[in-house]
Structures are given as C-alpha cells and as structure tokens.
Amino acid sequence: MRENFKELPMGVRDYLPGEAALRRYLENLFVELVAKEGFQEVITPSFEYYETLRESSETDLIKFVDRTGELLALRGDMTTPIARVVSTKMKHRELPLKIFYAATVFSGNFSGRNKLREFKQLGIEVFGDITSKLESDLIKLMAVYLRKAKVKNLEISLGHVDILTGLIEEYELFNHFSEIKNALNQKDYVALEGIFERAGKSQRVRESLVDFLQQRGGKAILRKAKKMLSHPKAKKALEELEEVTEYLISEGVRELKLDFSLVRDLNYYTGLVFEAYTPYLGYPLGGGGRYDTLLKKFGWDTPAFGFALGLERIVESIANSIDK
C-alpha cells in the first residue's frame, strides 16, 4: 500500500461543509437564472472517444485506453460534448436551441493558472439564429449572474478572432500564426516582437503591431484600430465589436474593456470572444464566444455562441475579496 494513501493526488481537492454549501448556492443561482431565460439542461458522459474531444484542447486531455482497446478521454470542456449532442440528437428542434450545463470537466495540464485537474463549469450554449443582439444579451446574462454571485470589481474583456486573422493576412504573417497566438495568450509582448522580427518586419512595423495588440480600453481605441487595419475581415470585426459594445452600454453593462489581443486558448472560436475578470483573481473567471465551424464535424452546419464560468474560480475570487 502506498504511504500517501490518505492524501489526494495533485490537482484535486475536497470541499468541506462551508465551502460545499457556497458552491451549491452559486450553482443553484446560475441554474435558476438561466432556466428563467428559457435555457434547458443537457447532461453528457464524463468521458468520450478521444477523437470526439480532441478538437477543443488536444494537449490538455486526460487520455486512457479501455479493456476493448478504445482510446478514450475525459472531457476537457463542455462545448464539444454539447455540440455533439445537439448535432446528432436535437438539430430538428425549433431554433434557436438554448442549452445550459453545470458539469465537472478535467484537464491534464494543471500548471500556471490551471491549478486543478478536476473542476466544475457553469455554462450556456445557443445554436441556430445567432444575431449581434443575442450575443450581447448572453454577455449581459453572464454579467448579471456574476453580479448576483457578489463578484467584486467585475471586468469583461471583449475581442474578436478576425482582428488577429485580418492583421496576420494584412501583414503576411501566415507562417507565424501559432507562435503569435501563443504569445498573446501569455501576454508576452517581448516574445511577440521577436516573432515579428523573425518574420522580417521593420522596427517601425514591429513597434506599431505590438503597440496595437497591447491596446485595452473603451470605444476610443476602436478609432485607432480603424485607422491601422484595412483588411476587410478586421474592419468587419471592429464594426461588430462596436455594435456589441454600444448595445451592452445601453443595457447597463459598463464593466467592458476592448482587448485586441484576446484570442482565448481553445481552437474553435470564429468571431466575438470575451472573458470575465476580477482583480481578486489572477486569471479569468471564464469566458466564451462564437464558434461557427465546430458543429460541422458532427454533421450540422449551424452557428453557435456560448460561455463557461469556472465555479472554483468564482468561489476563490469571493474568498479573496472578503480577505482583503
């Protein structure tokens, strides 16, 4: 018998009565809120075929082989399993489909900001008729929930995948896309300038690109972006961002920051992306965005939009804000 049999493996933990009660309260608060907005719950298995799940975060999946020799994996997020369910079993229902979940997910990478290998996600996904107003309303719904959960000093960062895509095409950086995306995810602007240098860009262009991708703020930075980017994809993305920002402000969501470097670290996003932050946590509470191609893999070509929040992260941020 192992000497540490009384201990837990790294990346998992127990929740004692006080914290367990808070987790249950926050989960119930989410379920009640989204159910009132017409969302219906879907429950999926904790593990599926590896090939089904690899689209989302291949390197982080916990994989294993069962007794029949099948390669399986624990789900690393809920968007891909939900996409599979609605594509294969629900696509003939009235659109838009509005789905919610409160489910445990798993990660093989628990370094850096991912401290846990097992954690709970609270999320919603909408499939079908995705309009700019619907996207805005879902971001507002996330903000309303986090306010009700008593998350202090909430900030919501908004970005768009096609800002980076347009920039890469305009400045002919195709061969460096993965490097650029990784540097942006790490907010490593020194590495970013090095990538531009290896791509043969002049010092003036390098400095201009890095300065642009560091921009975070209100609507004023959109004007600067429109002057710098001429690629049709980027210009359309900026127009969409402006439309969503104006609508959210008119609806009382003022915790907004535009962030041109926001790309998120999942592979399937195709449009608007966003993340929720608080100064009481050193990483996002959660986030989401638009994904129009993921469902094609399962035989249904339809747009989708959603978000997921980390329950443990919400609890941690609340505890940190009380301590301070």
Swiss-Prot record:
Pathway: Amino-acid biosynthesis; L-histidine biosynthesis; L-histidine from 5-phospho-alpha-D-ribose 1-diphosphate: step 1/9. GO terms for molecular function: catalytic activity, acting on a protein; histidine-tRNA ligase activity; transferase activity. It holds the Pfam family tRNA-synt_His. Keywords: Amino-acid biosynthesis, Cytoplasm, Histidine biosynthesis. It is found in: Cytoplasm. InterPro entries: aa-tRNA-synth_II, aa-tRNA-synth_II/BPL/LPL, HisRS-like_core, HisRS/HisZ, HisZ. SUPFAM superfamilies: Class II aaRS and biotin synthetases. One of its GO terms (cellular component) is cytoplasm. Gene3D superfamilies: Bira Bifunctional Protein, Domain 2. One of its GO terms (biological process) is histidyl-tRNA aminoacylation. NCBIfam families: hisZ_biosyn_reg. PANTHER family: HISTIDINE--TRNA LIGASE, MITOCHONDRIAL-RELATED, HISTIDYL-TRNA SYNTHETASE. This function is generally fulfilled by the C-terminal part of HisG, which is missing in some bacteria such as this one. Heteromultimer composed of HisG and HisZ subunits. Belongs to the class-II aminoacyl-tRNA synthetase family. HisZ subfamily. Required for the first step of histidine biosynthesis. May allow the feedback regulation of ATP phosphoribosyltransferase activity by histidine. This is ATP phosphoribosyltransferase regulatory subunit. It comes from Carboxydothermus hydrogenoformans (strain ATCC BAA-161 / DSM 6008 / Z-2901).
